[in-house]
Amino acid sequence: MILTITMNPSIDISYPLDVLNLDSVNRVTKVTKTAGGKGLNVTRVLKQLDADVLASGLLGGFFGDFIKNDLNINGIKHSFSDISGETRNCIAILHEGNQTEILESGPNISEKEANNFLRHFELLVDKANIISISGSLPLGISKDFYVKMLSICNKKDKRVVLDCSGEELRQVLKNDSKPFAIKPNIDELSDLLGVKVKDSIEDLKLILNTPMFNGIEWIVISMGAKGSFAKHNDKFYRVIIPKIQVVNPVGSGDSTIAGLTKGLNDGETDENVLKIANTLGMLNAQEHITGYVNMDNYKNLFEKIKVVEV
């Protein structure tokens, strides 16, 4: 079983408009509301791959119940830890080829609720083959919370695919409890290091060989239309992807994480792990809906991706 974790889930609301009129009334006829958050995007793609997946994290209030119901409708198993606060909304206004986002910060989690989740998480980890943890931490939870979760997983010899950035990732990298795999993009890597990272093979090799990344078996660097660069133990790979028509890139990183997690869980070769991950990321970018892939196009894209050891 694959366990996915979303610590700060949301209801993702999409408002498509021909024109956004500021300081005026804007009427929307077609509204889309889905269970959101990076980990739940990962979950939906894994479900489309027919993976045995269980979603967990923190949920509360009416909006938390909405998310549970949405997952039930889509046949996705879940086991969340309840909180007293209200799960957040994230609003995307699609207008004139632009996307304006209004993101609520979400509920403030108490120390008791955080500890309750850790106990719940430990029980779920026992049943999991691999764990995918994605996204930011909610208010009230310390930035080293992922370190605590990783410590639980490492003690049980369970692999973790971690997709986070900023201070959460810094805390992970400076501690002994490391994930099995991470997937920063070039901008997140630059923010982490405090310098502009170039996407040259030589520079990326030097960076990924620095001590801060010691103990992480897989590192995949997303480079958008340029594909990706990866390190697995002592091997480096350049992933070259075909040019595609991008419809909506939001959620492509989450789809890539789903593919990475699925490939690792299934014991695929290095080449196939990277091809699966990149194929799913591209498939998501070709859709209007976040966390959705059209598997009819999977084989065609998969066969066009090249993985070269460098």
Swiss-Prot record:
It catalyses: D-tagatofuranose 6-phosphate + ATP = D-tagatofuranose 1,6-bisphosphate + ADP + H(+). InterPro entries: Carboh/pur_kinase_PfkB_CS (IPR002173), LacC (IPR005926), PfkB_dom (IPR011611), Ribokinase-like (IPR029056), Tagatose/fructose_Pkinase (IPR017583). NCBIfam families: 1-PFK, lacC, PRK13508.1. Belongs to the carbohydrate kinase PfkB family. LacC subfamily. This is Tagatose-6-phosphate kinase. The keyword Disulfide bond does not apply. One of its GO terms (biological process) is D-tagatose 6-phosphate catabolic process. Pathway: Carbohydrate metabolism; D-tagatose 6-phosphate degradation; D-glyceraldehyde 3-phosphate and glycerone phosphate from D-tagatose 6-phosphate: step 1/2. It comes from Clostridium perfringens (strain 13 / Type A). It comes from the Bacteria. Signal peptide: none annotated. Keywords: ATP-binding, Kinase, Lactose metabolism, Nucleotide-binding, Transferase. GO terms for cellular component: cytosol. It is an enzyme of class 2 (transferase). GO terms for molecular function: ATP binding; phosphofructokinase activity; tagatose-6-phosphate kinase activity. Its EC number is 2.7.1.144. The keyword Nucleotide-binding applies.
